[in-house]
C-alpha cells in the first residue's frame, strides 16, 4: 500500500513522517526498494457487529461531533477551493464546544478498568495528530504496536479555553481534566448515543462498544 496526501488535513502523513506535498510523496514511493512496516488500528464494534481498520483515530463525543459539523458544513467546500479547509474545522470547533454535553463511558485499557461520568472527548489514536495537525496525543508513535487513548472531561468554557492554550503548547498532559493512556488493547463502552468518527468519516449517533488492537500494514514510503 502507498499513501499520497491530497486532502486538507493529512494527519496520517504527519504521523507517519510522510511529505505533505503529493509530488514529493510520489517520488519517495517510486524510489522505495521495499515497504516499511506501519502499525495501524483494528477495531470491532460489538453492537453493530462492524469490523474495520483505522490509520489515524476513532473518536466519540466532541471530536466526532466536530467532524460531523465540518463534513456537513456549507462553507467547507468553498474554503477548500482556497486551501483554507482548516478554517472550516475551526468554525466547527467553536460551535461544538458550546453544544457537546458530557456523557458516561467505561474503559478497559490493557486490563486497567476506568470509569468516567462526564466524558467530553474520547479518542483512540495511532499517532499524535487529529483535526489537521492538532497534537492531541503528543507522545503517540505510529511505529510502535500500541494504541493511545485520550479522554477529556466536560468542564466549563473558561477551563476549556485554558486547556486549549495548553494543547497549543503540547502541555495538555499537565491538566487533571486530560487523561492519556497507552495500551496494546483497548475497549470503550458508551451507552449514551454519541456521534462517532473513523479517520475523519462521521458515524451517526449511537451507543458504542468498541474493542481495539493493532495490526501490521506494509507501506511504500
Can you say where each PLM-predicted feature lies in the sequence?
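Short glycine-/acidic-enriched loop or helix-start segments at secondary-structure transitions
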Residues: 12-15, 65, 133-134, 161, ...
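Short, catalytically relevant binding-site loops at active-site mouths
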Residues: 62, 128-130, 156
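ATP/nucleoside-binding phosphotransfer catalytic cores, i.e., glycine-rich phosphate-binding loops
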Residues: 109-111, 116, 135, 141-221
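Short, hydrophobic/aliphatic alpha-helical segments
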Residues: 43-47, 117-119, 186-188
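Glycine-rich phosphate/pyrophosphate-binding beta-alpha loops
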Residues: 121-136, 202
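AMP-binding/adenylate-forming core of the ANL superfamily
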Residues: 53-55, 119-124
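Catalytic core of DAGKc-family lipid kinases
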Residues: 2-114
